[in-house]
């Protein structure tokens, strides 16, 4: 199975990069992982709604360039569905069983995802009603993908 994580912005913090590298290494026995970083747009401090929408659309266009027609797209969205780790592993397994060999997870920038990206998504997922820095969220997503594969393989995992 192929897993792509398409996210806005680059990871600058060494501790986050180290965590991403660790989970990437752990996941290598379960899937082919591809992490794609698209350029984030600078957001003015007092951006208007119109300016925010323009930024989201620019970032969204960059994201969509990396999504192929046959990808099963899971958008990370505050309004998405919250599920348990076991349900998340079922979602990944159902993709595999239905012939979706590539799952593309999409993480927006500080303003979230454009309507175009949300419309393209096959599934909208929320981890929490809380807001997390998108750089940190990448680590959280990788951990949950790793946990999902361990669940699917019947391997022990921390509950």
From Swiss-Prot:
**How the protein assembles, per its UniProt entry?**
Homodimer.
Q: Which InterPro entries match?
A: Alpha/beta_knot_MTases, RlmH-like, tRNA_m1G_MTases_N
The record's keywords, sorted A to Z, are: Cytoplasm, Methyltransferase, rRNA processing, S-adenosyl-L-methionine, Transferase
Any S-S bridges, and between which cysteines? none
Q: What does this protein do?
A: Specifically methylates the pseudouridine at position 1915 (m3Psi1915) in 23S rRNA.
Residue positions annotated to bind S-adenosyl-L-methionine are 76, 108, 127-132
Q: Which SUPFAM superfamilies match?
A: alpha/beta knot
Please report which protein family the annotation says this sequence is part of: Belongs to the RNA methyltransferase RlmH family.
Give this protein's Gene Ontology molecular function annotations. rRNA (pseudouridine-N3-)-methyltransferase activity
List the catalysed reactions. Answer: pseudouridine(1915) in 23S rRNA + S-adenosyl-L-methionine = N(3)-methylpseudouridine(1915) in 23S rRNA + S-adenosyl-L-homocysteine + H(+)
Q: Does the keyword Lipid biosynthesis apply?
A: no
Origin species, per record, is Clostridium botulinum (strain Loch Maree / Type A3)
* Intracellular or extracellular location(s): Cytoplasm
Pfam families from the xrefs?
A: SPOUT_MTase
Question: What Enzyme Commission number(s) appear in the record?
Answer: 2.1.1.177
Q: What is this protein called?
A: Ribosomal RNA large subunit methyltransferase H
- Output the superkingdom of the source species: Bacteria
Quote a single Gene Ontology cellular component term.
cytoplasm
